[in-house]
Each structure stands twice: as C-alpha cells, then as structure tokens.
Amino acid sequence: MYIFFPKLNPIIFTIGPVSARWYGFMYVISFLFAMWYGKKCSIKNKKIWYEKKIETLLYAIFLGSCIGGRIGYIIFYNFSYYSQNMLSVFYIWEGGMSFHGGLIGAIIVMSYFSFKYKKKILEISDFITPLIPFGLGAGRIGNFINSELWGRVSPNFSYAMIFPNSQNQDLKEIKKYPELQLLLDQYGALPRHPTQLYEFFLEGILLFFIIYFFSKKDRPTGSISGLFLIFYGLFRIFIEFFREPDPQIGLLKNIITMGQILSLPMIIAGLIIMYKSCYKK
C-alpha cells in the first residue's frame, strides 16, 4: 500500500576520517551550474556582468547565502539550543540551514555589489534569480537522500512513504493518535508525505521553467526577481501544509509553521516589486 524509502547511502565515499556526502555534493553541482548558466546568460546581457565579475559575484553570493542560511536557521528555528551550545554553531555537518536566512545573506551581498559597481540591486537580482531554482531542487534531492525533512503522517495516502528514521517523531504521533499504533507495528514507521520530492518538483523543476520562460524576453527591471519571490513563497506555503513542522518549534499557535510565516513577506515583497516594475509609471 505504501512506498518504502529506498536504501540510499548518504555517503558517496570515505577517505580516512573524511566522508564525502551527497548533500554536500548537491551544493557543489549547484554552484557549478550557477557558474555555467550565469556565464551563458551574460553573453546575452553583457551590460550587467562580465565573466570575471560573474565569478566574483557568484563566489560572494554562495558564501553569503551559506553564512546567512546558517545564521537564519539558528535565529528562526533553534535559537534556544544554540544560545546554550555556542560551539555547535560551527558544526555545519550536523545540518541546519534556512533558505530564508540564505536569501537575506544573498541580498546583503547583492547590496554591496550594487553599491560597489553602481548598479541597481534589482538588475543584479534579476540576473541571479534564474540560477537559483536548480540549486533548490538539488538541495531537496540531498535532503531526500539523507532521509530528512519528510512530511506529515498520512495513513490514507496510497503513495505515502515509510521513512525508517522517523520513528522518534512517530512515537510522538502515537501519543496523540493511538490508533496509528497498528501501522507502526506493521511497517516499523508511519507513512508520511515525501515532501522533499514535492519541493524538488515545485521549487526546483517548475519554478525553474517559470523563471526560464519568463526571462527569455526583455522584462522590466525587478519583474524577474518579483516573480521568483511570489512563486517561491506560494510553493513553500503550500508544501508546508504537508511537511512535518520542526519538532523544536511545531505549529505556531497550532496553526502556522515558521516556514509559512517567513514566506509571507516574500510574496508581499514580490507583489510590490512586480507592481512598481510593471505598472507604476
């Protein structure tokens, strides 16, 4: 009735004490794709960035988004833990990144480049935006291989997936819904939405093509960035209804997730940018 999580090894290879993981590899290929696609796009739009500037910009944004993603996760999702375990802030191999924090980090970097090179920040973000969805999709594949960020329990969904490492969270579900005990006994874990794959499709594939086809024509400055903010925010809010809330936070007011709260300003900002770019004279 349900789909069992495939036996995927999150480690590609190990040399001595060092292990190369698929999740980290997804960051690498995302950066390489951004470098390749960014240079390809620059051929059509040399007035914005030349090749050397593109490399510098992408290196800086990659670093800024990684730092911002880490700080964002600490502040938005687990501040109480990290405030008492300061050294754990640097244990990035244990996971803990926030897209919204990474976005803030990238905006800070783009603001600096905007000031340095005397270009509008929306010109820079319009150039960067088409490079983002591939990385989002690759990251979700990394999450899937790690068997993390799975969805909520869904016993009535035939294509729900059995994630073997969800058992600790499953036991909490059993306390609230004792009738699920039979499923836990039968399958060893409760069936859940494979939300990593949902996000891979919506944020990675679908969003990539939306931005790709929209940006093929000349658009008003800021409209590409605005469109990305709107659709990412909508997709993220939608998926959060199926995704298991972070256990240390849960549902805020038993209604909304942190991811949904952080995505709402993205939609509002995207609408404002689109309006000012396309309709305001």
Swiss-Prot record:
GO MF terms, alphabetically ordered: phosphatidylglycerol-prolipoprotein diacylglyceryl transferase activity
Source organism superkingdom: Bacteria
Cellular component aspect of the GO annotation: plasma membrane
Predominant localisation class: membrane
Residues bound to a 1,2-diacyl-sn-glycero-3-phospho-(1'-sn-glycerol): R140
GO BP, sorted A to Z: lipoprotein biosynthetic process
InterPro entries, per database record: Lgt
Localization terms from the record: Cell inner membrane
E.C. numbers: 2.5.1.145
Enzyme class: transferase
UniProt membrane topology term: Multi-pass membrane protein
Keywords from the UniProt entry: Cell inner membrane, Cell membrane, Membrane, Transferase, Transmembrane, Transmembrane helix
A UniProt-annotated Pfam family: LGT
NCBIfam families: lgt
Family membership noted in the UniProt record: Belongs to the Lgt family.
Primary role: Catalyzes the transfer of the diacylglyceryl group from phosphatidylglycerol to the sulfhydryl group of the N-terminal cysteine of a prolipoprotein, the first step in the formation of mature lipoproteins.
Name the UniProt record assigns to this protein: Phosphatidylglycerol--prolipoprotein diacylglyceryl transferase
